[in-house]
Amino acid sequence: MAGVNEIRSTFLDYFRKNGHEVVPSSPLVPRNDPTLMFTNAGMVQFKNVFTGLEHRSYNRATTSQKCVRAGGKHNDLDNVGYTARHHTFFEMLGNFSFGDYFKEDAISFAWNLITREFGLPKDKLLVTVYHTDDDAANFWKKIAGLSDDRIIRIPTSDNFWAMGDTGPCGPCSEIFYDHGDHIWGGPPGSPEEDGDRFIEIWNLVFMQFEQQTPELRIDLPRPSIDTGMGLERIAAVLQGVHDNYDIDLFKALIRASEEATGVKAEGDFRASHRVIADHLRASSFLIADGVLPSNEGRGYVLRRIMRRAMRHAQLLGAKEPLMWRLLPALIREMGQAYPELIRAESLISETLKLEETRFRKTLERGLGLLSDASENLAEGDRLDGETAFKLYDTYGFPLDLTQDALRQRGIAVDTEGFNVAMERQKAEARANWTGSGEAATETIWFGIKDKVGATEFLGYETESAEGVIASLVRDGVEVPSVREGETISVVVNQTPFYGESGGQQGDTGTISGEGFVIAVKDTQKKGEGVFVHIGEVTEGTAKAGDVVELKVDSARRTRIRSNHSATHLLHEALRETLGTHVAQKGSLVAPDRLRFDFSHPKPISAEELEAVENLANEIILQNAPVTTRLMAVDDAIAEGAMALFGEKYGDEVRVVSMGTAKHGSKAGKAYSVELCGGTHVRQTGDIGLVRIISEGGVAAGVRRLEALTGEAARLYLEEQDERVKAIASALKTTSADVLDRVNALIDERKKLERELADARKKLALGGGSSDGGSAVEAVNGVNFLGKIVTGVSPRDLKPLADEGKKQVGSGVVLFIGVGEDGKASAVAAVTEDMVGRFSAVDLVRAASAALGGAGGGGRPDMAQAGGPDGAKAADAIAAVKALIA
């Protein structure tokens, strides 16, 4: 029986032998397409090739594409776990022709693969074609020898594919597998087509038309092919099972889930194991491709998937985070085909564990509320939308999690009421919001762009230039002129000023003309390519149409260049030190410092930080040239340039390279290569020095570095050196010996603390106490030692109580420690022969009550508690004595 990995390899090798380029799967976050939530089909990475906007070095391709369908139009989340073939994550096998072969070859390739390579019986196969596609029908007869009754003509859009209202389109031909008459269902196009007997395994799309208008469709000059076969579906057929979750890959993941929970995938628990197996794949691959759980966008879809799996883990009785424990099983099954799982294993594991830990308590409270709210609901009833919204708003329950939790009881959710509650909250938030008023004026820049065009940026080559004022804006209104003392925004036809973007702050400087000067305090990009210089008129009057000279604050720009280039070096150094899972999550490039946010699941050690800093400074010392090139985005990424997934890039991108790598697989190649529109130093040596000054966490799975470069780094080190000298002087030693002196003082302090603690213990166990309490006394014939002590930590009370038990021989001991803050800790101990008469837990609870506390716990022979009112320590001793009496 062929396994999933073997089936994938057979498919790709077959098309490689038939002249196709084997193209790696693109990431789940589509490159250069922010309109698409996730990659959901094999053709996504070739969209621009099909439309003619992009050209590749090959005209035939084959892929096994990672896909996610959860959220938006393509959302399979609700059905996952309950049906045989729904998944949030799946692999799409495909072959593509870009103006090369067409219908006859596509049908021939498909038929030969499934009947010869895969060995499927021909009498189990039938196909559909679009009802007017005589060519496809005739080719199926010619190549496959199919009779007319096994070539079904479909008149609906199910067999006609379109990219949108306009653009490439064409008929489809789908291949179906007949699982046998023991399963209910009819062939496609029949009244019973929704049954499970006939299952689509491959869809061949013949792109032969271009839809120009709703009424006009013309032939494409170079018709193309796009096919898609679900790997999980064909694996089920080849492995002789009817259910995708019974293939070898899912059986391995479900087996791992069974072993981790101790619960078999049977009965009511079957769906939960399936949900966990599916959602583990989706979550792990999304995290590996740079998506982290959050409350919006792609991150929220990931969080929904993870939380749905966590709820099913809870149904299986898992008391601790489960998903991360199953990750090794996933990597064993899929790591060879997708090495990004191995590279990002640490990030995936930590993210899964942290998210589940954080959500666990909220999940339990939310499920408690849901149980109470639905207690009186019967099958067929609906949970009100207000409660569903409260679960979402207060407990972080995505709507689909609530629906899933009620599903087995046959209870629906009032989604309309949920949406009403959601809109009401948004309206209230808008009504309560008081902003700066900037948002209301943003649309003005689109109007200015339409009137005067985009600003030409000259700042890569120069820091000064001449231009013409295209527009003046004051208080959100375009004006013909501005005068001294007014705060205004200026648009010039061309500028050397960099507009804030990509984390780099905007430039400052001056704009001057005949009789006027404008001090520019910030530069922003508005609308689509309009550079807005924000500042104050310090002299004279300026008018639209005036010729001006623009001068950037060169010293400030130099510091920004240094910090921006250092950010690139630190990014690569982090990836080299921590792993290639590190990806930029945000940055700030200012003149005085830099800040860099990146994906990593745990704090960075001092040794790792030092390694990162050393690697960056190594490249700085190379004094290597910093080069920039304009390239096609796919060519840049193919050369290893790092891009931010989800960002929109133009046809051409600016690629910034610096340094030469000395280690690893990149040795001898450029050290850092990134897509970047910012300004940079000319040589790495211009950075001077980079010094990391802090590292910390800012969100789950996101860390932050702050660093200084150049003169700021030198001044920082100088300041640190002065501090060390001052410390050395205070300790009467030299800077070189200051660490030894500090360690000696620490050792001396520890010794004195031990001696002081011993002295306090001896005093506490002495024959009397100035603090209160007494020596051993008889209470109702029972030896009792009650002591009030100060200066003894709560953790030292138990050893004191053990010593006290030795003193009394047989009886009860109570020690109360009163801290400097006035709070008290109490320890009660009972000798072994007295445990049958007295419980230390009962005694210490009586003491705690007298001290204003509640509770306490431990063993019958030793228990501990506390209270806020140490002044009542004597009352606590009296309360315990009263219990003994």
Swiss-Prot record:
Zn(2+) binds at H564, H568, C676, H680. Keywords: Aminoacyl-tRNA synthetase, ATP-binding, Cytoplasm, Ligase, Metal-binding, Nucleotide-binding, Protein biosynthesis, RNA-binding, tRNA-binding, Zinc. It is found in: Cytoplasm. The keyword Membrane does not apply. It comes from the Bacteria. GO terms for molecular function: alanine-tRNA ligase activity; aminoacyl-tRNA deacylase activity; ATP binding; tRNA binding; zinc ion binding. HAMAP family: Ala_tRNA_synth_B. Consists of three domains; the N-terminal catalytic domain, the editing domain and the C-terminal C-Ala domain. The editing domain removes incorrectly charged amino acids, while the C-Ala domain, along with tRNA(Ala), serves as a bridge to cooperatively bring together the editing and aminoacylation centers thus stimulating deacylation of misacylated tRNAs. This is Alanine--tRNA ligase. It comes from Brucella canis (strain ATCC 23365 / NCTC 10854 / RM-666). The lineage of its organism: Bacteria, Pseudomonadati, Pseudomonadota, Alphaproteobacteria, Hyphomicrobiales.
